[in-house]
Amino acid sequence: MASSIRRGLGAWTRLLSLLLLAAWEVGSGQLRYSVPEEAKHGTFVGRIAQDLGLELAELVPRLFRVASKRHGDLLEVNLQNGILFVNSRIDREELCGRSAECSIHLEVIVDRPLQVFHVEVEVKDINDNPPVFPMTVKTIRFPESRLLDSRFPLEGASDADIGVNALLSYKLSSSEFFFLDIQTNDELSESLSLVLGKSLDREETAEVNLLLVATDGGKPELTGTVQILIKVLDVNDNEPTFAQSVYKVKLLENTANGTLVVKLNASDADEGSNSEIVYSLGSDVSSTIQTKFTIDPISGEIRTKGKLDYEEAKSYEIQVTATDKGTPSMSGHCKISLKLVDINDNTPEVSITSLSLPISENASLGTVIALITVSDRDSGTNGHVTCSLTPHVPFKLVSTFKNYYSLVLDSALDRESVSAYELVVTARDGGSPSLWATTSVSIEVADVNDNAPAFAQPEYTVFVKENNPPGCHIFTVSAWDADAQENALVSYSLVERRVGERALSSYVSVHAESGKVYALQPLDHEEVELLQFQVTARDAGVPPLGSNVTLQVFVLDENDNAPALLAPRAGTAAGAVSELVPWSVGAGHVVAKVRAVDADSGYNAWLSYELQLGTGSARIPFRVGLYTGEISTTRALDEADSPRHRLLVLVKDHGEPALTATATVLVSLVESGQAPKASSRAWVGAAGSEATLVDVNVYLIIAICAVSSLLVLTVLLYTALRCSVPATEGARAPGKPTLVCSSAVGSWSYSQQRRQRVCSGEDPPKTDLMAFSPSLSQGPDSAEEKQLSESEYVGKPRQPNPDWRYSASLRAGMHSSVHLEEAGILRAGPGGPDQQWPTVSSATPEPEAGEVSPPVGAGVNSNSWTFKYGPGNPKQSGPGELPDKFIIPGSPAIISIRQEPANSQIDKSDFITFGKKEETKKKKKKKKGNKTQEKKEKGNSTTDNSDQ
């Protein structure tokens, strides 16, 4: 009963160990399948493509393949359906022998990108091998003198299968003398013994025939038998016995031949020849053991005979028999369990199984370049291999599985810095001393178009004189590309844009290969002062890369425009001007003002005024401001002065050579009652217009009061509609700001009832601008609006936006001395916001006027022009006053506005723009104004003569 319990516990212990081992193996692989041995050809193993996450359509293009170091023909993959199937007969016992683990390791490799998968196919054991005893008939000589419970060891059966299929149970045929005893040692191995249960009597029973049956645990069960023939002897009833039944020995694998393994010692209780013992190896010892070990039959010493190799066999079990010389002889048995100790005697092996070259320099981090396999036949620490790579390279080794490494990209590549790498992979084991092996990997970096052409600087400034010949070479741009071959082939082109009403390509062109920039036509400084454009450099890569460089072509001014005289007021010609001056005026009284403009800029547009004195003109009591053009008295007038003076004012620019224009001013000295006030400057007959205007206003007020009761509902409805509908550009609500001018640098708003718009081209020197008059003259039918304008809005101008900045066109024109008294204009130039040009708008006497520092050098660059003002700085405008002058941002104009009383008769000059188109519009407007004035005078209707 105890023997049966022990056998059951041993079986369950072995079964539990096998299950735990199998569970550990399942978790150790990346992808694992199982297949029974002896499976037929074509047997389904697993859907390997689906399990690896690969599409069936990718298998052939990505070169799906299965690699194995050994037994590569046992399994195959169908590339049409991605199924792993059995290709040839699989015999587990042939593959793995008695090993508890039996697996076929496969490497699945796919390209584009390179991926490697480790697949482990477990070969499951089937019960295809029956238990086999070493011999079919075993003869045992049993002395009759043996005591009860005497034991005779039996050699158990062996089963080539594993697990449950190799779990054997034994059954002995019934006998009154013997029974079978099965014992399990600490290594879970069973030892069979035939136990004497009843004393033998040779005279009664000379022989005993027994049948020992071994049955495995498979389904169906397989059995093996051995026939035991027991012969009963009379004498020598003691067998040799060993000191221990199992000897455990450890031996280094590099042990030299003839080294003593163990010395056995057996004893026999008999005497004489029956106690003499002869040692020998067991009869069932394999030939391998017989070639590796030898035993001395007398001393019982077991020594090594051949070379031992741990990588070939890790352990040996040697059966030894001790036989006495009795008649019949008796034998004793023991087992030597020899385990070899591994030493570090094998160098690691390194192999590259897949290599993807060359690698693109824009490959993403983590890209697998090569698969490296290392192996070491040693075990334990001696077989633990680590790989290292050449330091300071943009690659690294990543361990994917045991002894498998992937060479991956660790940092970004730059072919322009390093075009090729020579890597050294070193594999080193953990032995002491350690052994290592190296292999070289050459990696070339393929170029991609990752560098755009680069210019030496982002912006170039070019100076070209105006009136250049067509096709003139003005500059050469050059860009460099760090890439190679077609990726570094650079071509140049213009970035097309509009310059005013014309395309940029009508002004300049660039040679696609050389980068030379040509002016296609003569440039005009008065039309284009600054030609700013971009040139693109683009390589021939795919996709192409490009970069831009900005060219600022400054057209240098030449003095090719003479000063042009402007009319003193609307409706008059620009020829001779007549002025009436009272005899009673004192020194410094402004008589008239000569206005002139010059289309040039810089020194060429800097105008000066001087009187041309004839013979006998020494006592002329007039002078002209050098830079203001104001004609004023030098002293008080007396009776000795001529009542009429013809003054010739020479207007001259500062160009080389200087160009001039002459203005004629006729001054008549009259009595105080005959001349208009000096501040009004109205035409003759304007003084009598006030009475007529008052009568008209009275009639208008009476008419409005008469019909107001009938129109009150209409007015309320109209007001409600006006409040509900957003104000448009043409009709702004009173007090609402009106956008005058906007540009990239800011905007300025001003609130008025009427406005004038002057539009110029789109090129930088000319921009859209809008001019407003603070006091507007109204017709006879708009007296109410006139009263509202004068009472509410004239004294409340909108202040300009403080955030605006000077535009390039405004800065360029601030060198002109032209400044209209009411609506003056200066050409823009490249000057800065701190530059101011002296004007007469301050209305200060000559001694108190600002001091002007003339330019220190000629040329288009006027940044050196400095203007210094003395104590006569213009005073700040009050809350209810208009500023003397204001600048419209983004436009080449400085507008001076003086606020006069609403009933004053001061004329307001027309807004004047530069260019031929603007002069033509001005002439047409003046003709139209003259005709209107004549009609008004004939009709005896008086209107305000202020020009907007």
From Swiss-Prot:
Residues 755-801, 829-854, 868-948 are annotated as: Disordered. Residues 30-133, 157-242, 243-350, 351-455, 456-565, 588-678 form the Cadherin domain. Glycans are attached at N257, N265, N362, N548. Residues 783-795, 907-921 have a biased composition (Basic and acidic residues). One of its GO terms (cellular component) is plasma membrane. Residues 23-697 are extracellular. Residues 1-22 form the signal peptide. It is a single-pass type I membrane protein. It comes from the Eukaryota. PROSITE patterns: CADHERIN_1 (PS00232), CADHERIN_2 (PS50268). Residues 734-892 are annotated as: 5 X 4 AA repeats of P-X-X-P. GO terms for biological process: cell adhesion; homophilic cell adhesion via plasma membrane adhesion molecules; nervous system development. Keywords: Calcium, Cell adhesion, Cell membrane, Glycoprotein, Membrane, Repeat, Signal, Transmembrane, Transmembrane helix. Residues 719-948 are cytoplasmic. Its main location: membrane. It is found in: Cell membrane. The chain crosses the membrane at residues 698-718. Potential calcium-dependent cell-adhesion protein. May be involved in the establishment and maintenance of specific neuronal connections in the brain. This is Protocadherin alpha-2. The lineage of its organism: Eukaryota, Metazoa, Chordata, Craniata, Vertebrata. The gene is PCDHA2.
